[in-house]
Structure formats: C-alpha cells, structure tokens
C-alpha cells in the first residue's frame, strides 16, 4: 500500500503501519481497531485495497514464478477457478511456499500438461492439505474421527494446534476444493 501512487492506498498503508508500530511492533488491539475503522469508513474501498495488495504481493508473483519455471504453463490458459486456487494458495503459503505446493502437485500428477483442470485443482489442495503422522501436535476429537484424520497432522501446519489444523483441514480438503470444482463447472472452459 505504501508503494502505490494512489493517495487512498498510501493512507491505508500508513494507518495500518502506524497501528502496527504503536506501542511496540506487533499486531494487537491498535491494529485490529484500525483495521475495523478502515472497513467501517469505506468497506468497498478497503476491500479493493486488500485485493490489490494480495494480487500484487502474492498472486502475480506466484503466476510469474510458475510461468518462468514450469515450461508451457500459462495461468491464462485456465479458468477463473484454477486462478482462484493459485490466489488462495499464494495468500496462504506465500509465493515461495505456494510455488512448492503447486509444483509438487503437478509432479504428483506426472506434470500439468494434458491434465484435466479438475485434477489440477484437487492435486493442489491435496498437497496443500497433505497429512503426516510425524508431528508433535495432531488433530483429534469427533470431527477428526469422522474425517479419518485423528492422530494426524497437516504437513504444512505442524506448528499449529490440533484444533487449528482441523479447521484448516476442513477448509483445504473439503470446503475450498468443492467451491473451486463448482466454480469450474459453472465458469470453466
């Protein structure tokens, strides 16, 4: 936000930066209150700032990195569904982490070429939500039992509590893939 020519974007960036450093560096009450105030003042404008920030900081860099390093890959060859999957994974894992997730998913399929888009979506979410039994903190409880993940951990989220991992598991292995597949069915090529 601070690098933008638009004065509104810069003012949002400055306010958030000031809130972050107010009372010592870190997120907390000052930051949360400023975030809420920005949303209350202009929710549409603030949403636009957030989307542009994610696009410039995460989505465009992951697409550029994939297109530069995966021969023949172009995000423009795919529907909004797969592009949204790349957006989501880049925002979650960061550019470097998302690149690893996506290229591992492609490798698990034997490459991305000639793969149905639905398979690419499923493979990316499967890798992002990959399970491991080699972690100190694991998922447990009735919901974990129901999904067959009790005693397991998410490979990319082992530093999180079992409860957080279970919530992320449901998002990565149930909710987001289903929404992406529905979007593909509705808007796909």
Feature annotation, model-predicted:
Residues 98-189:
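Long, amphipathic alpha-helical surface segments
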Residues 50, 55-72, 92, 171-189:
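Extended amphipathic secondary-structure runs
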Residues 63, 68, 77-111:
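Surface-exposed interaction patches
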Residues 8-11, 91-96, 130-131:
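Solvent-exposed loop/turn segments at secondary-structure junctions
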Residues 11, 15, 33, 97, ...:
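Exposed alpha-helical structural elements
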Residues 3-4, 17, 50, 92, ...:
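Residue-identity detector for glutamine
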Residues 1-85:
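Acidic, aromatic-lined catalytic clefts of primarily extracellular/periplasmic carbohydrate-active enzymes
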